[in-house]
């Protein structure tokens, strides 16, 4: 299948690549089906893209590229919803807010996207802790 995206051209994908979000994601609750593909010529960023809306793609990054000790505790209800039997089946991604000023690019570490890569279901959750910021700077200033 092909997805003609507004910003990334034509992306080829298969039905098995589609990840289902029962509640959508905050701000886009009506969108339930997404795919993930790498940003061209970049090993760090990926695109989390709706297959239902050609101009709805979000840049995402693994939190472990930013915070080596990033840790979340899923509640039992969340584990059940995601059908997670094993934490190795969980893919954790965080949304990136781009800016033309590289120092103002931020990552939302407070609301990770959790995906069961085996079952292809996902949910964006909110961590009830001040440990992580909604607007964590992608690039820390050197001391």
From Swiss-Prot:
Pfam families: FliW. Keywords: Bacterial flagellum biogenesis, Chaperone, Cytoplasm, Translation regulation. GO terms for biological process: bacterial-type flagellum assembly; regulation of translation. It comes from the Bacteria. It is found in: Cytoplasm. GO terms for cellular component: cytoplasm. NCBIfam families: PRK13285.1-1 (NF009793). Belongs to the FliW family. HAMAP family: FliW. This is Flagellar assembly factor FliW. It comes from Clostridium botulinum (strain Okra / Type B1). The lineage of its organism: Bacteria, Bacillati, Bacillota, Clostridia, Eubacteriales.
């Amino acid at each position: 299948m092909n997805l003609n995206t507004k910003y990334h051209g034509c992306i080829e994908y298969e039905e098995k690549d589609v990840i289902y979000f029962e509640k959508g994601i905050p701000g886009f609750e009506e969108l339930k089906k997404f795919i993930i593909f790498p940003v061209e010529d970049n090993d760090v960023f990926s695109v989390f893209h709706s297959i239902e809306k050609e101009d709805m793609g979000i840049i995402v990054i693994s939190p472990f590229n930013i915070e080596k000790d990033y840790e979340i505790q899923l509640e039992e209800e969340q584990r059940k919803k995601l059908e997670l039997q094993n934490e190795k089946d969980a893919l954790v991604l965080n949304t990136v807010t781009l800016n033309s000023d590289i120092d103002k690019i931020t990552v939302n570490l407070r609301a990770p996207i959790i995906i069961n890569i085996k079952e292809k279901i996902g949910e964006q959750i909110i961590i009830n802790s001040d440990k992580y910021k909604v607007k964590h700077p992608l690039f820390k200033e050197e001391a």
